[in-house]
């Protein structure tokens, strides 16, 4: 373990699996005390915490639906009560939808925006008042916002909203020395990414990157950890595309 984040408390939304799990584990390995958030995956969240504890880190699992103000409030309240004042917020919770725009239902549209945009809005709104001065926020977007891929219109719309909200929020939080940045992964080898894809699809997307492979959750986690750290203290209001040279 390193001491990069020693004494810091981090909330990572949607961290029971995939990229979120990797971010939580990475921060814990660098001495942060981590809130592993899940909505319905209790067993998976507990497994992530158990693995962190086995490796000598500090973490607890917190059930909270960040699509609601009550859920976001619960997340911060439990973190503060159990681990102390919060220094870092990582908004990783998200959903994806592959459908031509004309086929997307109103319910699907609302559901996707509730997770990807409203969840980020609600936690950032709380962070504006409750994150410790000098803290750091990283919101997850996607490199697909620049690819204009058919069937991605609704998903990309949610991530574009997150990016623009983050850029402006960074300016608003400057007075408290709180940095706000975005990380936009490219195709990353996770359960969410692989859902509904054939091996041919996976290989085709891997070859789109200059480095000719899919990213791993650990690739993204290391970028997020760096952005949160004091080493990135002059990086603010930026969108870091971690995609192996995809775009």
Language model regions located:
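C-terminal helical subdomain
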Residues: 182, 203-235, 242-244
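Conserved glycine-rich cofactor-binding loop
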Residues: 9, 16-17
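Substrate-binding pocket helix/loop in short-chain dehydrogenase/reductase
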Residues: 100-101, 105-113, 193, 201, ...
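Active-site helix of classical SDR
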Residues: 124, 158, 166
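Active-site loop-to-helix junction immediately N-terminal to the catalytic Tyr of the SDR YXXXK motif
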Residues: 104, 144, 148-156, 168
């Amino acid at each position: 373990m390193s001491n990069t984040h020693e004494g810091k408390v981090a909330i990572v939304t949607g961290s029971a699996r995939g990229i979120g799990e990797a971010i939580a584990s990475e921060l814990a390995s660098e001495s942060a005390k981590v809130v592993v958030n899940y909505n319905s995956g209790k067993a998976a969240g507990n497994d992530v915490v158990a693995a962190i504890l086995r490796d000598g880190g500090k973490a607890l699992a917190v059930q909270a639906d960040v699509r609601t103000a009550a859920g976001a409030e619960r997340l911060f309240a439990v973190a503060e009560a159990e681990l102390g004042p919060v220094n870092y917020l990582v908004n990783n919770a998200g959903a994806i939808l592959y459908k031509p725009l004309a086929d997307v239902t109103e319910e699907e549209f609302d559901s996707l925006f509730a997770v990807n945009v409203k969840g980020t809005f609600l936690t950032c709104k709380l962070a504006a008042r409750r994150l410790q001065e000098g803290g750091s926020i990283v919101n997850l977007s996607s490199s697909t916002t620049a690819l204009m891929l058919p069937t991605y219109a609704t998903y990309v719309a949610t991530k574009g909203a997150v990016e623009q909200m983050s850029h402006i929020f960074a300016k608003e939080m400057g007075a408290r020395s709180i940095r706000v940045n975005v990380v936009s992964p490219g195709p990353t080898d996770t359960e969410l990414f692989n859902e509904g894809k054939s091996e041919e699809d996976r290989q085709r997307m891997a070859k789109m990157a200059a480095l000719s492979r899919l990213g791993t959750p650990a690739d993204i986690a290391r970028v997020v950890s760096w952005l949160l750290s004091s080493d990135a203290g002059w990086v603010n209001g930026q969108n870091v595309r971690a995609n192996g040279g995809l775009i």
